Design a protein with these regions (language model features):
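N-terminal secretory signal peptides that target proteins for export/translocation
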Residues: 1-10
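N-terminal, post-signal-peptide region of Sec/Tat-exported proteins
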Residues: 50-90, 221, 226-227, 232-234
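Extracytoplasmic/periplasmic, Sec-exported soluble proteins
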Residues: 38, 46-53, 91, 100, ...
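Non-cytosolic coordination micro-motifs
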Residues: 29-76, 110-193
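Bacterial N-terminal signal peptides
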Residues: 13-23
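Sec/Tat signal peptide C-region and signal peptidase I cleavage site
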Residues: 24-28
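Mid-chain, structured segments of secreted extracytoplasmic proteins
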Residues: 69-120, 243
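Mature, structured domains enriched in cysteine- and short glycine motifs
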Residues: 181-243
């Protein structure tokens, strides 16, 4: 049987699919980033800051800085405005509008630098091109949230325009995962506390979380159950003060 020619339409579709796959593969190859945080050079555009800095290192870089309170998850945040604060050295922070620092357990895990309209790279494409060379990173950063973001091994870099001028954010993604896990654990613990019941080992009575009489049970006599069903299986009965 002679071979049947492939219809022109089907052939065209097939060629388009092949072309799309080639472009996708090429794009993925171009944006691959295996760099690690500790491999990043000290880019002059970051004005002496880098991920992983301690409080003491930041204080040495900016003596007037005052650190904020650390929350229950180990996170502390602070922003400085070198252009407006008379206490900051204008020379070492030339063309910088804002610097925001996020710490986790005393280490810098997010760094944001926003630049003035006098900064040397104002267009997003030229900013990404310049910063990629300065940080020794791949030149192609995929579009993300109105800017361009590059995700590497354990960290990400986002470039965007704010009020017409560029800004860059470096984020320790491993640290962000740690923060998210701590918040989830705290939320789960709070939810468990809401449903937990207190048992009095002396009287074999239990008190739900919304029963104020539970406060009268001494710590030494308390037994904690995840819910009333568990308490009742253990032989406890609902206290009359809670009925």
């Amino acid at each position: 049987m002679p071979c049947q020619p492939i219809p022109i339409i089907k052939k065209t579709i097939w060629l388009l699919v092949l072309a799309l796959c080639s472009v996708t593969a090429a794009s993925a190859q171009q944006t691959n980033c295996s760099a690690k945080i500790d491999q990043l050079p000290d880019a002059p555009e970051l004005r002496g800051f880098h991920l992983g800095m301690t409080y003491d290192q930041v204080k040495a870089r900016v003596p007037p800085i005052q650190f904020g309170r650390t929350d229950e998850f180990g996170v502390a945040k602070i922003s400085i405005n070198p252009s407006f604060g008379p206490q900051f050295d204008k020379t070492s922070f030339a063309d910088v509008r804002t610097i925001s620092l996020d710490f986790l357990d005393g280490k810098l895990v997010t760094l944001w630098v926003g630049y003035e309209s006098t900064f040397k790279w104002q267009k997003l494409d030229e900013f990404v091109s310049g910063m990629s060379k300065s940080l020794n990173l791949p030149a192609v950063w995929p579009p993300k949230r109105g800017g361009q973001e590059l995700r590497c091994d354990g960290f990400s870099v986002l470039a965007s325009l704010i009020a017409g001028s560029p800004g860059i954010r470096l984020t320790d993604e491993v640290a962000q995962e740690t923060i998210a896990n701590r918040r989830e654990a705290a939320a789960a613990a709070a939810e468990a506390a809401e449903t937990a019941v207190i048992g009095d080992q002396r009287t074999k009575l239990y008190y739900p979380s919304d029963c104020s009489a539970r406060d009268k049970v001494p710590e030494a006599s308390r037994a904690t159950f995840k819910d009333k069903d568990e308490a009742e299986k253990a032989g406890y009965k609902l206290a009359k003060d809670c009925q």
